[in-house]
Amino acid sequence: MAGSSAGGGGVGETKVIYHLDEEETPYLVKIPVPAERITLGDFKSVLQRPAGAKYFFKSMDQDFGVVKEEISDDNARLPCFNGRVVSWLVSSDTPQPEVAPPAHESRTELVPPPPPLPPLPPERTSGIGDSRPPSFHPNVSSSHENLEPETETESVVSLRRDRPRRRDSSEHGAGGHRPGGPSRLERHLAGYESSSTLMTSELESTSLGDSDEDDTMSRFSSSTEQSSASRLLKRHRRRRKQRPPRMERTSSFSSVTDSTMSLNIITVTLNMEKYNFLGISIVGQSNERGDGGIYIGSIMKGGAVAADGRIEPGDMLLQVNDMNFENMSNDDAVRVLRDIVHKPGPIVLTVAKCWDPSPQAYFTLPRNEPIQPIDPAAWVSHSAALTGAFPAYPGSSSMSTITSGSSLPDGCEGRGLSVHMDMASVTKAMAAPESGLEVRDRMWLKITIPNAFLGSDVVDWLYHHVEGFPERREARKYASGLLKAGLIRHTVNKITFSEQCYYVFGDLSGGCESYLVNLSLNDNDGSSGASDQDTLAPLPGATPWPLLPTFSYQYPAPHPYSPQPPPYHELSSYTYGGGSASSQHSEGSRSSGSTRSDGGAGRTGRPEERAPESKSGSGSESELSSRGGSLRRGGEPGGTGDGGPPPSRGSTGAPPNLRALPGLHPYGAPSGMALPYNPMMVVMMPPPPPPVSTAVQPPGAPPVRDLGSVPPELTASRQSFHMAMGNPSEFFVDVM
């Protein structure tokens, strides 16, 4: 291959400087024709080269920028590039690395002429050059004509784990390469405008053209440009007599690493137990503009990356496992990839999706999120910090088995996840760094929510990772239970689960206390039409309905039943829940207007009379106060309940001495239904003798004031509270 450049000489003549084949020193000729009218015939008449020689001239292409154009028509005018003509002359008797229109740098004279092209391996779908998106070939400015050296290397790595590759070094010596080597490189570098072939058998001690028995396992690295700092080039200079000529860049990647570019970054976990090799080729680049990084050149069929399907040619490789590829040289990246693939366990690839000006296949906008600039290095460091937010399960740090849809620590793999396990254990497994749930910073109403995840992602994760869900709807109910239990939290304390909302993990260090404190009866699980309602829990400091506090006292020991109710100052932590009480609730759950229990009737000697004023049982405390004149102690008439039928048998005559746990919302069950006793939900208390009994408000209305401040004259509702809270066997919680 030869290169030349020409500039305008004197009036009516053109100076032509050309490189002939592999010679290092250029030649200068003067052609007595103006530069704007010089043709190939004029150039040939001066050189008088053999007829089989090829002539390449430097020109500007509208799509690719600076290219080397072959001209064979003697009448064609030679392109004038910035007032000069740049050319390369290739003799027909010199073996060349390429027969494609773009000319290439010189081959060493030690390489024999290329035989017919061997077939490509079945794993490879395309070469690096032709597999990259169009955005990798922008127009290049004329500043490249200074021929300053830049470095751009590319390596195709077919990573195979099944058998080690050892070759005798004498088989692939410094001067001997197989005849198939040049043709293999020709096929693979067909998409490049320039290339300088550097045989690098040091990487794997295999030949470049190992295309027969070890085709998919060969490693090679080629440099498209000359660099005095290239380690590989220094080796080849020591090994070969002739120095490859200095070439200017003829193609460049688009600056996808600029801070103004928005990148969609994904993390892919690959199961290497099912596949023998990774199946990607990487392209590395660094230049004076600061653009750098390792890019996916092409993807080979049959590999782990091709089976996953999410990584595309042109994506930027940011991190592999815990190794950051930002600003890493191409040779170091090849070495790191080779070492990682040879180790057991899964491989986690963090890639930035490439921006393509013609998005048709793999370019998609992030879901429901604005596009913002991102720094890949900052993202990787943030991701590394995020992985330490939640401790993994005890066990080996390396995961022995992994499926394409899950990657759980060893502590969970042995036993698996099921709906019968503790919710906290399932949530901890979901919060593990390698669980597969996408947890990252989210933007909502211009507010950054750190370490958030989408509700639909939680449902999908539960449905695919937890055994026991017959359909996805059940997994959604389970996610609603996680929200009620406080294991996941909404940003604004929304207590109704929605798949379109962002959530964060709650306190995963607490045990049964943190789980029970947030449970309530008959809460909407979000699985029906009521899931569209935006039910918000109160902010801290608001009225406790339905308050979600934490336990501030030790559990007392269970105590035998007592026929006396506890004094109301001991029931100050009791909270009501659940909207307005209506006739759908059993009479035993109403706080007003019901018949005295057996204990109460025995003391008074006669039943309470019912007043017909209140029908709904949802009167406020102020209404009870207004009727205080009709209320008497000791069983006098003046009840404020409705005139409905007497309460169910199961709700009368029960010992009332129990204290409701904070945050529990008792509701009545359908009439006539016996309910099991749940010791987790109620604790029996030994009450002191009640000196004064006061009335409590019916359920469904938020308390206006503390129960301890209710006047002692309001006593008519004591019996209804008797029945609502007296029998723990009817107190139940339906978690799901």
Curated annotation (Swiss-Prot):
Domain DIX: 11-93
Compositionally biased spans, kind Pro residues: 111-122, 558-568
Tissues/organs with expression: Ubiquitous.
Membrane topology value: Peripheral membrane protein
Name of the molecule in the record: Segment polarity protein dishevelled homolog DVL-2
Impact noted for substituting residue 27 to D: Loss of oligomerization. Abolishes interaction with DIXDC1. Abolishes activation of Wnt signaling
GO molecular function: frizzled binding; identical protein binding; protein domain specific binding; protein kinase binding; protein-macromolecule adaptor activity; small GTPase binding
Job description of the protein: Plays a role in the signal transduction pathways mediated by multiple Wnt genes. Participates both in canonical and non-canonical Wnt signaling by binding to the cytoplasmic C-terminus of frizzled family members and transducing the Wnt signal to down-stream effectors. Promotes internalization and degradation of frizzled proteins upon Wnt signaling.
SUPFAM superfamilies named among the record's database cross-references: PDZ domain-like, Ubiquitin-like, Winged helix' DNA-binding domain
Gene Ontology annotations of biological process type: canonical Wnt signaling pathway; cochlea morphogenesis; convergent extension involved in neural plate elongation; convergent extension involved in organogenesis; heart development; heart looping; heart morphogenesis; intracellular signal transduction
Protein family (similarity comment): Belongs to the DSH family.
Basic and acidic residues: bias regions: 159-171
Superkingdom of the source species: Eukaryota
Listed InterPro entries: DEP_dom, Dishevelled_C-dom, Dishevelled_fam, Dishevelled_protein_dom, DIX, DIX_dom_sf, Dsh/Dvl-rel, DVL2
Mutation effect (residue 64 to A): Reduces oligomerization. Reduces activation of Wnt signaling
Transmembrane segments: none
Localization per record: Cell membrane; Cytoplasm, Cytosol; Cytoplasmic vesicle; Nucleus
Stated consequence of mutating residue 84 to A: Strongly reduced interaction with DIXDC1
DEP domain location: 433-507
Disulfide bonds: none
CC annotations in GO: aggresome; apical part of cell; cell cortex; clathrin-coated vesicle; cytoplasm; cytoplasmic vesicle; cytoskeleton; cytosol
